[in-house]
């Protein structure tokens, strides 16, 4: 090719690729689903056709069997009838032949021959040949023997039997042909109905019809053979039946004396052992009576148990009536403002003037009353109301702010006043039933009794005693759900046997909170009361330090004191009293105390609680502190 000429591809050689259209996957999936659905439907139709074909075959078999059985029954009945007729005819012939003369016997033979000729005409060729042979044989015997002998009589009997047999065979064959025709007609009717119902499955039905016809023909042939065999067996069966009937009669006759023997044996047994039988029946009756008595006793015990439950309630009422006689109303000289100490940053009894008290001890006419410190306040004398609006003046024997326990003493000459029975709070159980007796809202609702349970044990509740909006100490209490209202403070908490187990002191008074009251355990209250009776006050150890909570420190204060970052709880020493126990123990300002007496300290309330718990033994306590960011151990003295 020349370089100057432009290279051009002829158009007939230029074959542009055909544009490939977008491959529609959804359409192919839809077509595939439709194809699979058609295949499933075709498969179901084939299965249904097979099922229908099997049903048709079963119905045809059942129809054939029913028809053949019915025909066989009719045939057997007919054969039995013919046999009975033949036997009766033979008996008549036997009787007649003995009384007939020789000419009469010859005439009877001729009649039998004519009857044989008439019967054998409609039979088959094989039967004709057999009869011709029999006739020829009989004729030969007739020529040899004399005509009027006993042999001729026997031959006549044999001929009559042969005639009857030929009749029976002829009837059997005619009935068999009828059966075959009827079975064919029934099968054709069934096939026609099936063809009308299943036009789409002609080929399958045709094949099924052919097989069914073959089966039917084979079955009919077998049945015909069986019928011929049964004819021979029926003779033997009839003989067996007669024999069996005779045996049954004999057995029945033998069993009658046996039954009589058993009845006699039963009667003899009853005569011999009647006493034992009576004893056994009596024992059974006694057992039944005992079981009935036990069941009634169980019912009575259940009734008694329910009545015991009622008596428990009655005991509760008695306990309430008894406790009411030991509870008094306490009023101090300050203006009336009926409240109750609370824990919601406001006090239940802000002015501390009206509440309740419990008489726990009596010496002659002198009664000792247990109440709360926040009711008595700083007064030395208070007014009490008891019985039916009777009043008296009580002297304050002692008070303890930290435990909220005060003891009063009053001289009262009244037989209705009596000290309450004291129990033990260490035996209290969660969920135990209790009664609260007090004077809510003063004398207007005095001797009010409410019922509840112990909702919690060992509750440490923070309380503000000096009204500076700062909690001063944790008070050890147990929680109750009985109704506690202003004026119930100092009231009695009574257990189910009427014993004093606590002294009402606090309640939570916050929105959406109900039924959370707290009582001081009687064991702790009684210990404080005994000490107040002796000394008039409670002396607590004082370490002589001013403290602040670590959680209240500002970030710059933590940096100045070099408090480690992982220390979030504890107390910081802010002040030290000259010659105080804290300074003598080696504490310095800025020390951070995190452990005391092997217990972690959360705040100043817990520090004070641990110190106060050792008010009697005053032992030296080990402490862990941080000083300048370094931890060390020291020992704090309490005396």
From Swiss-Prot:
Membership in a protein family: Belongs to the peptidase S1C family.
Top-tier EC class: hydrolase
Active-site residues per Swiss-Prot or TrEMBL entry: 374 (charge relay system), 404 (charge relay system), 489 (charge relay system)
Membrane topology term: Single-pass membrane protein
Compartment list: Cell membrane
Stored PANTHER family: PEPTIDASE S12, PROTEASE DO-LIKE 8, CHLOROPLASTIC
Comp. bias regions, Polar residues: 206-219
Listed name of the protein: Serine protease HtrA-like
Key word NAD present: no
Keywords annotated in UniProt: Cell membrane, Hydrolase, Membrane, Protease, Serine protease, Transmembrane, Transmembrane helix
SUPFAM superfamilies: PDZ domain-like (SSF50156), Trypsin-like serine proteases (SSF50494)
Disordered: region residues: 1-262
